[in-house]
Amino acid sequence: MASLQTQMISFYLIFLSILLTTIFFFKVNSTETTSFSITKFSPDQQNLIFQGDGYTTKGKLTLTKAVKSTVGRALYSTPIHIWDRDTGNVANFVTSFTFVIDAPSSYNVADGFTFFIAPVDTKPQTGGGYLGVFNSKEYDKTSQTVAVEFDTFYNAAWDPSNKERHIGIDVNSIKSVSTKSWNLQNGERANVVIAFNAATNVLTVTLTYPNSLEEENVTSYTLNEVVPLKDVVPEWVRIGFSATTGAEFAAHEVHSWSFHSELGGTSSSKQAADA
């Protein structure tokens, strides 16, 4: 009898070991994905959260009109699992979008436009040069925000000393950790691709103005920076856009947006397609 009990205990221990190993294997080797594609915005776009002056109309997302002192934001409605606390894994992601900055005068444009990653409960921050995403030029780890800015107005307190319009990567501060000078083509559509490689922690930004079918007339800018997302943003985040105006202004519009992320070591997926 004792021998039978011992055999049963051994069997259950072996079974439990196999079960736990199997669960761990599938957890480590599974992938959680989030994907969506918006090729044309609708007036009642259900998968966006609007903040400030952001709204959709006529197939586009308008963050600000060309008027003074406005802040407009739009967030994807579903939180994104950007890294996993149990495994330590971080998601690879790529997002692409087209946007237009259109000002009455190409010389007097403000303030700019961002794509950002922030806590789920994110709210509009300071306007003007802070682009509705940050409140300080000093590093603030409680911000838990990474942004890619397309900055059209020079602020002496934190912008590059060359005073040029620029693309910047911002980590917990409006003062960019890396910048690339950028010649705004007023009223022209820009194509942007932002990609994050979790293996290297490299965030890559590419902006292209395909203003002609002739290859030599395509203007392109690329910016790279190491950004340890897991050390900056929460495990679950929201992604979105923000734009602001000040004493000078411009209309800031997004015409299309897609996003795809893959997080290894989890076991669920979310996909959405929006025409």
UniProtKB/Swiss-Prot annotation:
Keyword Manganese: yes
Top-level taxon of the source organism: Eukaryota
Matches recorded under PROSITE patterns: LECTIN_LEGUME_ALPHA (PS00308), LECTIN_LEGUME_BETA (PS00307)
Signal peptide: 1-30
Reported modifications of this chain: The mature form consists of two chains, alpha and beta, produced by cleavage of the immature protein. These remain cleaved, yet fold together to form one subunit.
An annotated Gene Ontology molecular function: D-mannose binding
Stored SUPFAM superfamilies: Concanavalin A-like lectins/glucanases
Cited InterPro entries: ConA-like_dom_sf, L-lectin, Lectin_LegA_CS, Lectin_legB_Mn/Ca_BS, Legume_lectin_dom, Leguminous_Lectin
Residues of the site described as Cleavage: P210, N211, N217, V218
Prodomain residues: 211-217, 270-275
Presence of keyword Metal-binding: yes
Keyword field: Calcium, Lectin, Manganese, Mannose-binding, Metal-binding, Signal
Protein residues bound to D-glucose: D111, G129, G246, A247
Residues that hold Ca(2+) according to the record: D151, F153, N155, D159
Chain residues that bind Mn(2+): E149, D151, D159, H166
Known function: D-mannose specific lectin.
Family from the record: Belongs to the leguminous lectin family.
Note, other: Binds two manganese (or other transition metal) ions and two calcium ions per heterotetramer. The metal ions are essential for the saccharide-binding activity.
Subunit structure: Heterotetramer of two alpha and two beta chains.
Name assigned to this protein: Lectin
Organism lineage string: Eukaryota, Viridiplantae, Streptophyta, Embryophyta, Tracheophyta
